[in-house]
Curated annotation (Swiss-Prot):
Organism: Salmonella typhi
Ranges that cross the membrane: 13-33, 38-58, 69-89, 93-113, 121-141, 152-172, 370-390, 407-427, 431-451, 460-480, 482-502
UniProt lineage: Bacteria, Pseudomonadati, Pseudomonadota, Gammaproteobacteria, Enterobacterales
Periplasmic membrane side: 1-12, 59-68, 114-120, 173-369, 428-430, 481
Membrane topology recorded in Swiss-Prot or TrEMBL: Multi-pass membrane protein
Protein purpose: Forms an efflux pump with AaeA. Could function as a metabolic relief valve, allowing to eliminate certain compounds when they accumulate to high levels in the cell.
Name the UniProt record assigns to this protein: p-hydroxybenzoic acid efflux pump subunit AaeB
Keywords: Cell inner membrane, Cell membrane, Membrane, Transmembrane, Transmembrane helix, Transport
Location relative to the cell: Cell inner membrane
Pfam entry (one): FUSC
GO molecular function: transmembrane transporter activity
Similarity comment: family membership: Belongs to the aromatic acid exporter ArAE (TC 2.A.85) family.
Length: 655
């Protein structure tokens, strides 16, 4: 396929984007809005953003969800701007500086919340800055400007959603059904590898791939939930299926680790059962039936606990999978599974990274303010707006430098493209609404094709071109003003890029260490006799952290193995029959406090001291378990955990 070719699957979304832009333009001029450009720009960004992220037409619900986030972010930003202006109207410089700090604060928050919701916080940061900068000459018009901006943005979002509904968006349901089947087959094949106890690298690749696929399925669940309220039952089942899939991975990997020291635990009967190859979910179903019969014949005590748990989880997976595919009423058996254990959310390990993002956004906005005041450039405010937009959006993504480069390419491409529209197309079409709409529809169509290909600069070019062409009411054509706006965008993106290069993010190693220590803390916290605490389901949170670790350190197998071992230890200790008495309960609380001190320690020396204290306490705990005659199901996992912590002490304490 050539660089300028158009694939059939890209045409529908390109038409959808063109329709959203035309609707926003027509409504903006029909209702005599002062700046219809904001409505058009919002419609374009809301529609094109999910397509750029997905690398194709987004699934149903994605555009609506992004639109709702944009409305929320805009209202938060407008309220913040009004509060800042009312409080500091007599000190304009201080007012702008506080807005810069507000933009940084919103970026900090957006770095800590879920990636889907971070868009609203990033938007609220630069919305307040845009309002404060725009009303510098006429501060008394602030409420009117904020209201107009909110109205125009709501109109733009409404147009994007209407266009999405008109062109029958894709449903993700079929993809979910297909992935559920494939995932169960892959889970069975992973257990086959673990039973064979073959090459460790092959096993690592298999479970790593399953962790990624389970995370992707959770993302599909979020999309399905946004799509329609009729998938509420499927959404509940998919939440439980996420935990079951992670349980299957954990039990398979524990089976592999057990065979390192006690291969005789896996009997020949189960080895023969797992030698049968499977290709489809029906094959897996037949094999599970055979295994359940074997377990009934041999008895639960003669079955390795990991295999017994794996077969039970796979059976529940099959039951819920059928319910997701049919979307029927939830049965009593399913309800019992769904009413299982409350899922625990873990604290973010990226606090230092979030603080770096705060300083990047704040410093770049302050630098833009100083540049504007020092040069007195009429488009310095435009440069400041671009700085805030780029840094607020770039900081939420794994590679902010590439986002900045995308914006730089986009603003550079917008200069000749905007020039064509400003000098030739719009002056010759402004007398006819039909021709004006057609001209912008052509722009939206062709950029919509490139956005789906994730062409570098395409998203930036779309937003920057609409921002600089004359779409105000009434239209005025001042070439110097156009050139200033175009150059202001380019300068703003370049200043943001310079700040991102200068303020380096060295938080990667710290984040990795915090993640590993959080795994240790989770394993330690599983040693409890508190019934409520033992029922807490930390597995999704732990695997979410493991997925983050895999993204931060691709290919670092020792880190992944250590994290997985801690997850296995957590699950085993959580189900272990720990003796119930006050002496052990008090010591459990002491162990948790020490583990928390390891995570929160501000220096390597403190961390080493607390970690050494934790190891000493674990030795004392083992002695207490011996005194209280704890069974091997308790003492062996604690011994394995203590041995792992001794072995990896340096990796868990050094920066």
């Amino acid at each position: 396929m050539g660089i300028f070719s158009i694939a059939n699957q890209h045409i529908r979304f390109a038409v959808k984007l063109a329709c959203a832009i035309v609707l926003a333009l027509f409504i903006g001029f029909h209702f005599q809005l002062e700046t219809p450009r904001w409505a058009v720009l919002t419609a374009a960004i809301v529609a094109a953003g999910p397509a750029f992220a997905a690398g194709g037409e987004p699934y149903s619900g994605a555009i609506r969800y992004r639109g709702m986030l944009r409305i929320i972010g805009t209202f938060i930003g407008c309220i913040a701007a009004l509060i800042i202006i009312i409080s500091m109207i007599r000190a304009p410089l201080l007012m702008i500086l506080v807005c810069c700090v507000w933009a940084g604060f919103c970026t900090w928050i957006s770095s800590l919340v879920r990636i889907e919701n971070s868009y609203a916080w990033g938007l609220s940061g630069y919305t307040a800055l845009i309002i404060v900068i725009t009303i510098q000459t006429e501060p008394l018009l602030t409420p009117q400007f904020a209201l107009e901006r909110c109205s125009e943005i709501v109109i733009g979002i409404g147009c994007a959603i209407l266009a999405d509904l008109l062109f029958s968006p894709r449903s993700i349901k079929q993809e979910v059904d297909r992935e559920l089947d494939c995932l169960l087959v892959a889970q069975y094949q992973l257990m086959q590898l673990c039973i064979k106890h073959g090459d460790s690298e092959e096993v690592d690749n298999a479970w790593g791939d399953l962790v990624r696929r389970t995370a992707a399925l959770e993302g599909m669940r979020s999309n399905l939930n946004m799509e329609s309220s009729r998938w509420v039952r499927a959404n509940r089942r998919l939440k439980a299926l996420n935990t079951l899939s992670l349980t299957l991975i954990t039990q398979s990997c524990e089976t592999y680790l057990i065979q390192n020291t006690r291969p005789e635990l896996i009997t020949d009967t189960f080895r023969e059962l797992f030698e049968t190859p499977v290709e489809t979910v029906q094959d897996v179903h037949r094999q599970l039936k055979r295994m359940r019969r074997v377990i009934v014949w041999t008895g639960e005590r003669e079955t390795p606990v990991t295999l017994y748990s794996w077969v039970g989880a796979a059976t529940r997976y099959l039951l819920l999978k059928r319910g997701v595919i049919s979307n029927t009423k939830i049965s009593a058996t399913e309800e019992e599974i769904l009413q299982g254990e409350p899922v625990v959310k873990v604290e973010s390990a990226e606090r230092h990274h979030a603080m770096v993002n705060f300083w990047r956004t704040t410093l770049s906005c302050i630098l833009g303010t100083l540049f504007w005041l020092w040069t007195g450039w009429t488009s310095g405010n435009g440069a400041m707006v671009m700085i805030a937009v780029v840094t607020s959006l770039a900081m939420r993504l794994p590679n902010p430098r590439m986002v900045c480069i995308d914006f730089i390419y986009g603003t550079l491409a917008a200069l000749p493209l905007g020039l064509l529209y400003f000098l030739v197309i719009i002056p010759n079409t402004q007398q006819s609404m039909l021709l004006l709409c057609l001209s912008l529809a052509v722009l939206g169509f062709f950029i919509g094709i490139e956005v789906q290909k994730r062409r570098l600069g395409s998203m930036g070019a779309l937003a920057s071109t609409i921002n600089i062409i004359v779409l105000d009411n009434p239209m005025t054509f001042h070439f110097i003003q156009f050139l200033d706006s175009a150059l202001g965008q380019i300068v703003g993106c370049m200043l943001a890029f310079i700040v991102i290069l200068l303020v380096r993010d060295k938080s990667k190693d710290r984040t990795g260490r915090v993640l590993l220590n959080q795994f240790v803390s989770a394993a330690v916290s599983a040693m409890t006799t508190n019934v409520v605490r033992r029922k807490e389901n930390r597995l999704p949170a732990l695997y979410q952290q493991l997925f983050l670790l895999m993204n931060k350190f691709p290919g670092d197998l020792p880190k992944f193995r250590l994290a997985l071992t801690m997850i296995i230890a957590h699950q085993r200790l959580r189900d272990a029959p720990i003796p119930v008495n006050e002496d052990l309960s008090v010591f459990h609380r002491q162990l948790r406090r020490t583990a928390d001190h390891v995570i929160s320690a501000g220096s390597d020396d403190k961390r080493r001291r607390y970690f050494g204290q934790l190891l000493d306490e674990l030795d004392i705990y083992q002695e207490k378990l011996r005194i209280w005659e704890a069974p091997p199901q308790v003492t062996e996992p604690v011994k394995r955990l203590t041995g792992m912590l001794h072995k990896y002490q340096n990796a868990l304490t050094d920066s």
